[in-house]
Regions:
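Core structural elements
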Residues: 1-4, 51-53
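Histidine-centered catalytic/metal-binding microenvironments
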Residues: 3-7, 11, 22
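TRNA-recognition modules of translation machinery and tRNA-sensing kinases, especially anticodon-binding
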Residues: 13, 17-313
Length: 313
């Protein structure tokens, strides 16, 4: 029914003189139409191939791969920070390569104290060390801000130790609260709130006398064991976690020694007017207790069988 074939069929009916010219014109037109159709067909085929190969940018990037998560140490540190931020503390930070002055001298640590020995501290030179605790951050915070001050100092610290419960590099969170009328009862109340937030609402804390150069009095702080009842399991056996004591050693603390305040007296810390408490804990230790990790080195071995047990929260 197309017009061109019908026209070509009428050629025999034409005068002989007209047949050749009209036939040639008709064939030329048919050739042009066929070539145009072939080109169009090729374009459509190419478009279909392109559509098959097109990338849908709305699809997930790698749906078959498991999503990573925060490392257990990072998550534990964040949990600790959240507790103290909720209690009104602020986060303070400082350098990891620190002055001996801020690491020891300002913290009432005598020149003969064993912690200053090269067997216990990484020395860069005679005046500079890799910090052995984040306490220098507290000194810097007091120099930068007059009282009252409530800060925590999380960060990496370094000591030449390497065994199941010690690594050359680990993480601490230390805290400092200085104001008028701060007492040991305030310290205990703060740490009780921390213990219940981290280890459970039924926990209690026990303060045992101890010695630290920068606090007086000084205490070791234990948390009631959450794995047993007063040191014993339901079957009557001794608790493997607390070794039957009913308590778990968690951190060290105490009231800031007046000699520390005397070092920063010119910045508003008159030991006759202000008092304060300080505390410090190892993040790895907290994570070990919360999650039953037996060896500190597991945190840093990069073993995915271990790391995948602790997903993001």
């Amino acid at each position: 029914k197309a017009e061109l074939p019908q026209l070509l069929r009428t050629i025999p009916q034409l005068e002989p003189a007209e047949r050749a010219a009209i036939g040639a014109a008709g064939n030329a037109a048919r050739g042009q139409i066929e070539r145009a159709l072939e080109l169009k067909e090729a374009d459509l085929a190419a478009g279909e191939i392109a559509a098959d190969d097109a990338i849908d940018v709305s699809l997930p990037g790698a749906p078959s791969l498991p999503v990573g998560h925060v490392h257990l140490i990072t998550q534990t540190r964040r949990d600790i920070e959240d507790v103290f931020l909720g209690l009104g503390f602020q986060v303070a930070e400082g350098p990891e390569v620190e002055l001996v002055e801020y690491t020891f001298d300002a913290l009432n640590t005598d020149v003969t104290h064993p912690s200053r020995a090269r067997t216990d501290t990484f020395y860069i030179d005679d005046d500079t060390v890799l910090r052995v605790h984040t306490s220098p951050v507290q000194v810097r915070a007091m120099i930068a801000q007059p009282p009252p001050i409530y800060v925590i100092a999380p960060g990496r610290v370094y000591r030449p130790d390497n065994d199941a419960t010690h690594t050359p590099q680990f993480h601490q969170v230390e805290g400092l609260a200085v104001d008028e009328g701060v007492t040991l009862a305030d310290l205990k109340g703060t740490l009780l709130a921390f213990a219940r937030a981290i280890f459970g609402p039924d926990r209690d804390v026990l303060l045992r006398p101890h010695f630290f150069p920068f606090t007086e009095p000084s205490v070791e702080v234990d948390v009631s064991c959450f794995n047993c009842d007063a040191g014993y399991m339901r079957d009557g056996s001794r608790c493997p976690l607390c070794k039957g004591s009913g308590w778990l050693e968690v951190l060290g603390a105490g009231m800031v020694d007046p000699n520390v305040f005397d070092y920063v007296r010119e910045y508003g810390y008159d030991p006759d007017k202000v008092t304060g408490f300080a505390f410090g804990m190892g993040v790895e230790r907290i994570a070990m207790l919360r999650h039953g990790v037996p060896d500190l080195r597991l945190y840093f071995d990069g073993d995915l069988r271990f790391l995948r047990q602790f997903g993001a929260r």
